[in-house]
């Protein structure tokens, strides 16, 4: 059942098509997709803004802190209202780059699918993605507590799979011919004394 689904964590180098895979799945299933890069989020935008609410317990009134709806969840509900599509994927990219102040809330979100009192809508699943630390200086390694809350899938570049995709996308034959002969050039990242030199799968399309 969707409500029991552990969030997926697609883990692999940059530019190999993690986002494209999620978008293709959503398209083929005819479901919605809302994408966010977590590097762009502060604690306030992810969790919502605090405000004071008056509540009554018995005969007494008290002021308590509440939070507005998370910008992330609000986008999902907005998508449903706009399209009428109540099933979809909430895709959170660069999930292992969240700030230290946001990490505890993200840990809770991965387990309970909620920010504060606001939950991910029924019918929506969470898919996340991230890069290994050697490719991104902002990455924070996941500990056991976090990994226990997600279903980790290692994603690697595969030229033969990409070649089939490239033919369907009408990638120029000269590019495919070149890579047939020079497969070592398909995906390459190298740190030189001067700068980082790289070519990724994304760069060939």
Write out the residue ranges for each language-model feature.
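Conserved AAA+ ATPase small/helical "lid" subdomain
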Residues: 166-205
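AAA+ P-loop NTPase catalytic core and its hallmark functional loops
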Residues: 1-181
